[in-house]
Design a protein with these regions (language model features):
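Hydrophobic alpha-helical segments
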Residues: 3, 7, 12-13, 19-20, ...
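Soluble extramembrane regions of membrane proteins in the secretory/endomembrane system
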Residues: 250-386
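Juxtamembrane/start-of-transmembrane alpha-helix segments at the extracytoplasmic/lumenal side
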Residues: 129, 151-153, 382-400
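Cytosolic-side transmembrane helix boundary signature
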Residues: 130-160
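Alpha-helical transmembrane segments
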Residues: 73, 133-145, 401-417
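Membrane-interface segments at or immediately adjacent to transmembrane helices
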Residues: 168-264
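Internal/C-terminal transmembrane anchor helices
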Residues: 150-178
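Juxtamembrane interface at the cytosolic side of transmembrane helices
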Residues: 84, 286-291, 390, 400-430
């Protein structure tokens, strides 16, 4: 019976640990996105426009992503077992309560449990926590009996490496752009084709959901768009038989110019290179790269590349930005939400080639003043590229740490088994 209980605890430890590691990593990939999700949760008590709100939510994002990953990692490695088991139960109690609240009140669209990688409904998120909570209690009940991959003397080494590693990983994803972009505007996306496909799909849904009511000889009948009656019938009305109010397009990219005219066709149908400098608000945009932005605009103009600023700022904020930076490029208006979805940096650069996103850069990665010309001249041949090698090496290093620990664990177990077998044989010989 005790053996079965310990086995269940071990299985529960692995499940809870893997979920925590996966959830923590998927959120740590995009700490700014996690901060935006936290701000939605805290909106009733902390207005996103209030002073310090962005700093508070970003700090909470780092704490949430880091603690969730570390809890899972420590559980998998079997270090600080009792402490981590208690924290995991506390964590699951809080998360279960939060997901129950979202299930009842529906304050946000999705829970954000796995970042933008996996979007669960409120019910799915709540059921996930209902399963994980008793599993974490199982782990707590037999915490001291759990197998460990590192001894008491050794455990501080993987613990410190894990803490330093996840902090560095999150900092890099914040300073640059997310390690993996799970959003609709990832590098390599052909916006021209993707938006056209979505619009065509919506039109099919609208046509299928619309019934056309005609009358003839005192009788009325509903027809579909593909099978309308002849001219002897009289049109009465069109009815929408499906509720499309909850429909949310995947692509919400429809900027307008200073006259209020849509310019999406101009941007996406243009052949060649188009540069977009985006920021939800010029008031909060970093001023650390003003010289680089000016050089980008001037060199782009010399090469004939269209260059636009895209923002949700007020006219006063735009005027202030022009005064501070000398910006003469045209400004386009777009809601702050799609801007934050497109790029997590303030400001950030998006490069389109024939309607396809070929590069995205946080302001920390803007080319230097001296390197602007080389960068812009490389764009016609540039191929979409992945994240920096540093973060890739970091993830491989952590995976290697786990593999080494498991190999050491099984080597010790094999050594002990062989030792006991030899001892038993010697005893029988005597």
């Amino acid at each position: 019976m005790i053996h079965v209980r310990h086995t269940l605890a071990e299985v529960a430890r692995v499940i809870v640990g893997l979920v925590f590691v996966g959830s923590g990593l998927l959120k740590a990939v995009d700490p700014v996105g996690t901060a935006l999700k936290i701000s939605q949760y805290l909106a009733p008590i902390l207005s996103p426009a209030s002073a310090g709100a962005e700093t508070i939510t970003l700090a909470l994002s780092f704490v949430l992503c880091g603690s969730e990953f570390l809890l899972g990692a420590f559980l998998l490695m079997g270090v600080y077992r009792k402490f981590c088991a208690r924290l995991s139960v506390l964590f699951m109690l809080v998360m279960t309560a939060v997901t129950l609240y979202t299930l009842i009140a529906n304050p946000i669209s999705d829970c954000g449990c796995f970042g933008d990688a996996i979007q669960l409904t409120h019910l799915e998120s709540f059921l996930k926590n209902v399963v994980l909570l008793p599993l974490s209690i199982l782990v707590l009940r037999d915490a001291r009996a759990l197998r460990h991959l590192y001894s008491r003397r050794e455990r501080w080494v993987p613990a410190v490496l894990s803490v330093v590693g996840i902090i560095y990983f999150m900092a890099e994803n914040y300073r640059h752009l997310p390690y993996i972009d799970f959003r609709p505007y990832a590098v390599g996306t052909n916006l021209r084709e993707a938006i056209a496909k979505e619009e065509a799909s919506l039109q099919r849904v609208l046509l299928g959901a619309t019934k056309y009511i005609y009358s003839k000889d005192g009788k009325t009948k509903a027809f579909e768009a593909s099978a309308l009656p002849d001219s002897t019938w009289t049109f009465v009305e069109a009815r929408q038989e499906a509720d499309l109010a909850s429909y949310k397009p995947r692509y919400d990219f429809n900027p307008i110019d200073s006259l209020g005219e849509p310019v999406i066709s101009t941007l996406l149908d243009s052949e060649g290179i188009t540069l977009l400098l985006l920021s939800p608000s010029w008031r909060t945009a970093s001023q650390a790269v003003l010289d680089e932005i000016s050089e980008l605009h001037e060199e782009a103009s010399r090469l004939g590349y269209p260059f636009y600023g895209v923002t949700a700022s007020t006219s006063e904020e735009i005027a202030q930005w022009r005064y501070l930076t000398g910006a003469s490029y045209p400004m386009l208006q777009l809601d702050a939400t799609p801007i934050r979805t497109i790029i997590r940096s303030q400001p950030g650069l998006v490069v389109l080639r024939d309607g396809k996103i070929i590069d995205k850069r946080a302001y920390a990665d803007f080319p230097s003043v001296e390197g602007v010309s080389t960068y812009l001249r490389s764009l016609p041949q540039m191929q979409p590229h992945g994240p920096s090698a540093t973060r890739t090496y970091l993830l491989w290093a952590w995976a290697a740490l786990q593999l080494l620990a498991f190999l050491r664990f099984w080597a010790r177990k094999l050594h002990l088994t062989v030792h006991l077998h030899i001892k038993k044989r010697l005893h029988l010989t005597k």
